[in-house]
């Protein structure tokens, strides 16, 4: 009997299931995808992962599970604060993970209007790739494969 082949494991951090459903459907034979819908779940899942995949916007996340720029939960934020936090929650979770010593390669799915902002994020939260919506599954799969083989960081 042949030993079971383990697949590279990636944490998908989002407030719904759109990304993880798509990845499991189209890339699931090659990779294992684990859901994480907040900082605590992402940190726990990261311990056995090859990389992290982030949505940017977390509109469906309850306020008591959002983190701010310091990685702290915000108790009953006002509407303006909540809007600001949900619109950048993927970045804030990744920033908190980096501050806690999680150095796994990450991909952030975001259409940023400013290339300078994308470059800043990629430098300050490295290793990070900011992936615009035009990036297809083939490109995403190739990046994941590179991480799994150890040829990318």
Tell where the protein language model's regions lie, with residue ranges.
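Acidic, metal-coordinating helix/loop segments flanking the phosphotransfer/catalytic sites
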Residues: 17, 35-51, 58-67, 73-79
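A short acidic (Asp/Glu
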Residues: 21-24, 63-66, 117-121
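Conserved acidic residues
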Residues: 50, 127-128
């Amino acid at each position: 009997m042949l030993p079971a082949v383990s697949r590279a494991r990636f944490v998908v951090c989002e407030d719904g299931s759109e990304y993880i459903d798509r990845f499991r459907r189209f890339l699931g034979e090659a990779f294992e995808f684990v859901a994480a819908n907040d900082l605590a779940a992402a940190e726990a899942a990261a311990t056995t992962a090859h990389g992290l995949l982030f949505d940017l916007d977390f509109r469906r996340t309850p306020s008591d599970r959002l983190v701010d720029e310091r990685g702290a939960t915000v108790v009953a934020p006002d509407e303006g604060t909540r809007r600001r936090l949900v619109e950048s929650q993927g970045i804030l979770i990744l920033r908190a993970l980096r501050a806690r010593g999680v150095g796994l390669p990450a991909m952030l799915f975001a259409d940023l209007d400013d290339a300078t902002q994308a470059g800043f994020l990629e430098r300050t939260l490295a290793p990070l790739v900011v992936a615009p919506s035009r990036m297809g599954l083939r490109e995403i799969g190739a990046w994941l494969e590179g991480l799994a083989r150890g040829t990318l960081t």
